[in-house]
Curated annotation (Swiss-Prot):
Family matches, as InterPro entries: GalNAc-T, Glyco_trans_2-like, Nucleotide-diphossugar_trans, Ricin_B-like_lectins, Ricin_B_lectin
Organism listed in the record: Homo sapiens
A cellular-component GO term for this protein: Golgi membrane
Tissue note: Detected in renal tubules (at protein level). Highly expressed in fetal and adult kidney. Widely expressed at low level. Weakly expressed in whole brain, cerebellum, thymus, lung, mammary gland, liver, stomach, small intestine, colon, pancreas, spleen, bladder, uterus, placenta, testis, ovary, skeletal muscle, leukocyte, B-cell, bone marrow, fetal brain, fetal thymus, fetal lung, fetal liver, fetal small intestine, fetal spleen, fetal skeletal and fetus. Detected in renal tubules (at protein level).
Cytoplasmic topological domain residue ranges: 1-6
Cellular compartment(s): Golgi apparatus membrane
Record-listed substrate binding positions: 151, 176, 200, 305, 336, 339, 341
Name used for this protein in its record: Polypeptide N-acetylgalactosaminyltransferase 14
Pathway terms, separated by semicolons: Protein modification; protein glycosylation
Highest taxon of the lineage: Eukaryota
């Protein structure tokens, strides 16, 4: 009997041990994001990829639009085309994730996604590198399709030739539609249960998609974004971005990245935890397709580009969803300093129209602060927003007051929203902006005060805002240096920039940071036409420093 017992002990113990191991293994597989070794996802064999790429003549595709020696490499795309073409479409980039991200395991039944990339006259080298990075660094079974939407580029072959690549489809607009309507067109034909929007000058990093799809699979109302790394526009060096950033904005609806507060950082016990963000940059995100449709897609009446990220961000938060940045997902992006393409109504006018539509539909009584920051938006047409107001009502969305209190309490409400608008006069002359020879920003000068059809000439109308800026459209009075005699120039407005802040003291307009006063200096031939706008030490006796703000 003892011998029989001894014989049974080892087999029984072995079975129990195997059972325990199986129990822990199954439990581990059921956990959504436990720590452990990285899951190996199925990938096509090298031979399969080689066969697919053999059907595409990459050299011929790139050479057809190649930069030519002697041409300005920045002219067409506002980044260094020569350097982009020098770099392989298949280049390696550094893995910029936190080390703990590499230990996360994701479930194997993530939903495949439709990747939508819209573009207009994109450089072929960056477009191809975007697609190739997706194909190289994404598990094949997670890509339902890659939908390219060509927004009426000059050359249809920019898109058409790319359908030879695996998973790629091409749609071409018959006329320029802009980002919003192009994205909607791509989303309408998408067959995936989730939509992944990317810009056309990106490079996705290792295991970028799984963390995003995982968050949406857990909760379909989440809209999730990667951390956006920087691809240098001059050298195309891939640069790691800080992970503890979120999207923010000011009352002019100008997007800006902001650091998490010390309190928010202290609450983050794990660097892989998603970060709630009041607003997304808008270029790169994943959203459940049914949720996208239910929320009303995009505002179809927004033009070209700009402001759509505010509209969708307010709508998601106020109508029952949430926005997140997922630190374990990284995507590089070329950030340009200016747009390389033409806006039919001008960049500033288009942005004002789009943001004004957002303010009128979503910001309730707080839109007064938008108009105080952008006074020239008051008179701009913005189309009919009744359908978007009806959408908000039908979705039973929260108020903008709720959004400020619960999502973005850090946005301080101005104590006042008054605006003074009109001429800045010196006797019979008015401060005027004059644009010459297609220069990017106009010059300042004194000119005879003028009227057009009974109204003050637009080039002579200025607004003095509660932010202590003197502006015209998107441009603010600023100084190059803080020294006497420094020229006063027009630059893009930026809230909080002390070089752009002024105060009216009696007949003086004083620059706050330098304590110098707005003045005119003679130059050139010494005539009235040769007066330069500068700042100088304030002197009450100088008539050249006496200014009147005359309301329109």
């Amino acid at each position: 009997m003892r011998r029989l017992t001894r014989r049974l002990v080892l087999p029984v113990f072995g079975v129990l041990w195997i059972t325990v191991l199986l129990f822990f293994w199954v439990t581990k597989r059921k956990l959504e994001v436990p720590t452990g070794p990285e899951v190996q996802t199925p990938k096509p064999s090298d031979a399969d990829w080689d066969d697919l790429w053999d059907q595409f003549d990459e050299r011929r595709y790139l050479n057809a639009k190649k930069w030519r020696v002697g041409d300005d490499p920045y002219k067409l795309y506002a980044f260094n085309q020569r350097e982009s073409e020098r770099i392989s479409s298949n280049r390696a980039i550094p893995d910029t994730r936190h080390l703990r991200c590499t230990l996360l395991v994701y479930c194997t039944d993530l939903p495949p996604t439709s990747i939508i990339i819209t573009f207009h006259n994109e450089a072929r080298s960056t477009l191809l590198r975007t697609i190739r990075s997706v194909l190289n660094r994404t598990p094949t079974h997670l890509i339902r399709e890659i939908i390219l939407v060509d927004d009426f580029s000059n050359d249809p072959d920019d898109c058409k030739q790319l359908i030879k690549l695996p998973k790629v489809k091409c749609l071409r607009n018959n006329e320029r539609q802009g980002l919003v309507r192009s994205r909607i067109r791509g989303a309408d034909i998408a067959q995936g249960t989730t939509l992944t929007f990317l810009d056309s000058h990106c490079e996705v990093n290792r295991d970028w998609l799984q963390p995003l799809l995982h968050r949406v699979k857990e909760d379909y109302t989440r809209v999730v974004c990667p951390v956006i790394d920087i691809i240098n526009l001059d050298t195309f060096t891939y640069i790691e971005s800080a992970s503890e950033l979120r999207g923010g904005f000011d009352w002019s609806l100008h997007f800006q990245w902001e650091q998490l507060s010390p309190e928010q950082k202290a609450r983050r016990l794990d660097p892989t935890e998603p970060i709630r963000t009041p607003i997304i940059a808008g270029g790169l995100f994943v959203i459940d397709k049914a949720w996208f449709d239910y929320l009303g897609k995009y505002d179809m009446d927004m033009d070209i580009w700009g402001g759509e990220n505010f509209e969708i961000s307010f709508r998601v938060w106020m109508c029952g969803g949430s926005l997140e940045i997922v630190p374990c997902s990284r995507v590089g992006h070329v950030f340009r300093k200016k747009h390389p393409y033409v806006f039919p109504d001008g960049n500033a006018n288009t942005y004002i129209k789009n943001t004004k539509r957002t303010a009128e539909v979503w910001m309730d009584e707080y839109k007064q602060y938008y108009y105080a920051a952008r006074p020239f938006a008051l008179e701009r047409p913005f189309g009919n927003v009744e359908s978007r107001l009806d959408l908000r009502k039908n979705l039973r969305c929260q108020s903008f007051k709720w959004y400020l209190e619960n999502i973005y309490p850090e946005l301080s409400i101005p104590k006042e929203s008054s605006i003074q608008k009109g001429n800045i006069r010196q006797r019979q002359k008015c401060l005027e902006s004059q644009r010459q020879n297609n220069q990017e920003t106009p010059n300042l000068k004194l000119s005879p005060c003028a009227k057009v059809k009974g109204e003050d000439a637009k080039s002579q109308v200025w607004a003095f805002t509660y932010t202590q800026q003197i502006l015209q459209e998107e441009l603010c009075l600023s100084v190059i240096t803080l020294f006497p005699g420094a020229p006063v120039v027009l630059v893009l407005c930026k809230n909080g920039d002390d070089r752009q802040q002024w105060t009216k003291t009696g007949s003086h307009i004083e620059h706050i940071a330098s304590h110098l006063c707005l003045d005119t200096d003679m130059f050139g031939d010494g005539t009235e036409n040769g007066k330069e706008i500068v700042v100088n030490p304030c002197e009450s006796s100088l008539m050249s420093q006496h200014w009147d703000m005359v309301s329109s």
